[in-house]
């Protein structure tokens, strides 16, 4: 039954590819659809590109205990047959190259400057903020349990939301927000705290910068590609609270200025330049 379904997917995808008369093939997911697209391209000797958005092996290990080598091996099988694989940051690119991934190119991220911008009046800046998925793999508990004189607000949902809300009643969990309402949370925060150890970029980081809010986090892939010590935030190898205390001293004007390199025009240019013609 499963083989029959896979065959139908492959045949349907083949028809769509042939009818599209496309110039380029980019496969953005590693799941069943991505594997099907990869199979078609290899069978027909069509060059294609892929991308890696997250540290998926680390996520799988944190949640299910599956060894890193197993998942990394599967990802290398999927991506190393591509002409190019797009990655978010230089540090993640270096890590992947050390793990045996090949033909990696940089593909950054941007933000909507019509929504994310500093508060003209300077803002309230009275709390510490986390925005993102409320889940164990985000290491959010490092933020929740951290001693702080400032209140803490968590924006976002996820599988650990209810349990963390019960465990940390002093933290204000406000749920999922978007658009101007989300931007207002950024603007009114004294510091944006990003405790994750497994993100490859973190769009929330540049959204915070665009609102003039300095970042505190750990010195790991993702944050260390974006945060400039004393300019737009602070990172620490072990102590999140120390990073927060330093970030609170950072000028919000220089923080905002550092966001200006993250434009969607640059992102689009990087993507277009990475594509490989199918014919």
Model-derived features with residue positions:
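Short alpha-helical donor nucleotide-sugar binding micro-motif in glycosyltransferases
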Residues: 17, 177, 184-189, 271
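Donor nucleotide-sugar binding/catalytic pocket of nucleotide-sugar-dependent glycosyltransferases
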Residues: 72-118
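Acidic anion/phosphate-binding donor-loop and adjacent secondary structure
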Residues: 111-126, 162-163
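Conserved donor-binding/catalytic core segment of Leloir-type glycosyltransferases
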Residues: 120-155
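Nucleotide-activated donor-binding/catalytic signature segment of Leloir-type glycosyltransferases, i.e.
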Residues: 162-180
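Aromatic "clamp/platform" in nucleotide-sugar-dependent glycosyltransferases that forms part
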Residues: 197
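A charged, aromatic-enriched C-terminal amphipathic alpha-helix characteristic of glycosyltransferases
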Residues: 238, 249-277
């Amino acid at each position: 039954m499963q083989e029959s379904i896979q065959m139908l997917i492959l045949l349907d995808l083949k028809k769509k590819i042939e009818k599209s008369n496309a110039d380029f093939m980019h496969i953005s997911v590693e799941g069943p659809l991505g594997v099907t697209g990869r199979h078609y391209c290899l069978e027909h000797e069509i060059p294609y590109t892929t991308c890696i958005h997250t540290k998926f092996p680390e996520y799988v290990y944190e949640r299910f205990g599956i060894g890193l080598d197993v998942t990394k091996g599967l990802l290398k099988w999927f991506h190393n047959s591509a002409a190019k694989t797009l990655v978010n940051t230089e540090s993640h690119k270096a890590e992947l190259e050390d793990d045996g991934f090949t033909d990696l190119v940089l593909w950054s991220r941007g933000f909507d400057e019509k929504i994310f911008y500093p508060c003209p009046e300077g803002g309230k800046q009275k709390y510490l903020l986390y925005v993102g998925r409320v889940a164990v793999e985000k290491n959010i508990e490092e933020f929740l349990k951290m001693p702080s004189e400032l209140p803490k607000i968590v924006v976002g949902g996820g599988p650990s939301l209810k349990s963390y809300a019960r465990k940390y009643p002093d933290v204000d969990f406000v749920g999922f927000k978007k658009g101007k309402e989300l931007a207002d949370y950024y603007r009114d925060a004294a510091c944006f705290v990003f405790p994750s150890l497994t993100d490859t970029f973190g769009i929330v980081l540049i959204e915070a910068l665009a609102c003039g809010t300095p970042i505190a986090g750990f010195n790991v892939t993702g944050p260390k590609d974006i945060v400039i010590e004393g300019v737009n935030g602070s990172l620490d190898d072990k102590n999140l609270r120390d990073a927060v205390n330093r970030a609170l001293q950072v000028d919000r004007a220089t923080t905002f200025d550092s966001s200006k390199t993250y434009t969607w025009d640059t992102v689009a240019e990087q993507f277009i330049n990475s594509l490989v013609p199918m014919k």
